Amino acid sequence: MANLRKTHPLLKIANDALVDLPAPSNISVWWNFGSLLGLCLATQILTGLFLAMHYTSDISTAFSSVCHICRDVSYGWLIRNIHANGASFFFICIYMHIARGLYYGSYLYKETWNIGVVLLLLTMMTAFVGYVLPWGQMSFWGATVITNLLSAVPYVGGALVQWIWGGFSVDNATLTRFFAFHFLFPFVIAAATVLHLLFLHETGSNNPAGINSDADKISFHPYFSYKDLLGFVAMLLGLTSLALFAPNLLGDPDNFTPANPLVTPPHIKPEWYFLFAYAILRSIPNKLGGVLALLFSILVLMVVPILHTSKQRGLTFRPLTQFLFWALVADMLILTWIGGMPVEHPFIIIGQVASVIYFTIFLVLSPLAGWAEIKALQWA
């Protein structure tokens, strides 16, 4: 009699994705981040669900309801701290996952990669609307500043902003709809994740050598299920440590003050994981130009597969492009630092130079380096 997991219509799907999935034998720890993202998503949905049971999306009670969750609800403080810091870990894992994709040429699986970029955009939208919900000062002013960017859209900008707001300013209608979006988007992300996996399993995983691994595959379970489990333990250890020992480390002190439309905080800035994009936005002294640069700072990932000029897939044996990759990592860190700084000298010029370098590496230097490496191999 055949094994039930191989014959049952539902179990067969799970089996092909998690148990009998043929995986390259040489994939490293960098391939752990996909499953870690799944864990992050599950954690966020679960903690978010419990928070939603006690939260009220009304401007007169939102801030108080968050205080109530932390003070009166059983383990509410823990659920909130895990949810707030879980978002940070989510983005750490996303950026690591994307970095691995860029380093090892995983972007050549175009459908998987493009759905991944869509997933990144969805996650960023979810995090943004979620940050507005506690209705603190930075929540309110962050919502005002970022939604106002839509007014840069020619002709329909003003109407678009009022449509998003549900009025003439960020008000009760805005908070209510943002809560609705924040509840809905994680399930959209989960659905897109299924598509992401569907397309990945059409081709199979890439590997550090960047070559076809059909001749040397091993089953996902038990080898990589246990390897992923180690990653789970490491991440959950980090998350719980942060949530228990330094829950407000990554937050903004301004968000402990209830939203006040009459008082603008001295420095309006988003959470740390958006600072690189915020720095790119601020580095262009034109509203529409800044918004386009902000959008393209993420959408540039979609053109990476088109601009792949090398005959080798990954960067394992390509020292020139390796240098560019690490220059990009350093540049992202500089942009993140600048995004949190006030708009004054020397931060303005540093941000502008870093923004130019960011786009130059993606659009000019990487394709050139790939081409140069091919030439060098031909001459060798």
Curated annotation (Swiss-Prot):
UniProt superkingdom: Eukaryota
PROSITE patterns attached to this UniProt entry:
CYTB_CTER, CYTB_NTER
Q: Cellular component per GO?
A: mitochondrial inner membrane; respiratory chain complex III
Recorded GO MF terms: metal ion binding; ubiquinol-cytochrome-c reductase activity
Membrane-protein topology: Multi-pass membrane protein
- Co-factor requirement: heme b
Compartment list: Mitochondrion inner membrane
- What keywords would UniProt list here? Electron transport, Heme, Iron, Membrane, Metal-binding, Mitochondrion, Mitochondrion inner membrane, Respiratory chain, Transmembrane, Transmembrane helix, Transport, Ubiquinone
Give the protein's biological function. Component of the ubiquinol-cytochrome c reductase complex (complex III or cytochrome b-c1 complex) that is part of the mitochondrial respiratory chain. The b-c1 complex mediates electron transfer from ubiquinol to cytochrome c. Contributes to the generation of a proton gradient across the mitochondrial membrane that is then used for ATP synthesis.
Name listed for the protein in its UniProt record: Cytochrome b
